[in-house]
């Protein structure tokens, strides 16, 4: 069964430009290099929710778990944490459209 990795975070104040450059140049290609398929990205304009929600899809939980247990994943997230705070993620069964 296909699964989706749902990730949320807030961009650190004053780091917005560097953050967007990192996401385009390193984070998205990094996810793809790990075997994930980026599928969604959402920006929260109003409300008390994480500023960014991004999703990546995988064919199954076992392949995703292998990635989440890898040092490459840990390194990619450590780089992301230079630009964001309140990083969190969860795994859900994949379906089309917006998922929380």
What name fits each language-model region?
Residues 24-39, 57-92:
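An amphipathic, aromatic/His-enriched active-site/gating alpha helix that lines ligand/cofactor pockets
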Residues 3-10:
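Active-site-flanking beta-strand signature of metal-NTP-handling nucleotidyl enzymes
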Residues 41-44:
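Short, solvent-exposed loop/turn elements at beta->coil junctions and helix N-caps
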Residues 92-100:
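Short, low-order "capping/linker" segments at domain edges
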Residues 15, 62-64, 97:
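Residue-level signal for secondary-structure boundary sites
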Residues 46-50:
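Short acidic/glycine-enriched loop/turn segments that link adjacent beta-strands
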Residues 10-22:
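Short, surface-exposed ligand-recognition loops at beta-strand->loop->(often short) alpha-helix junctions
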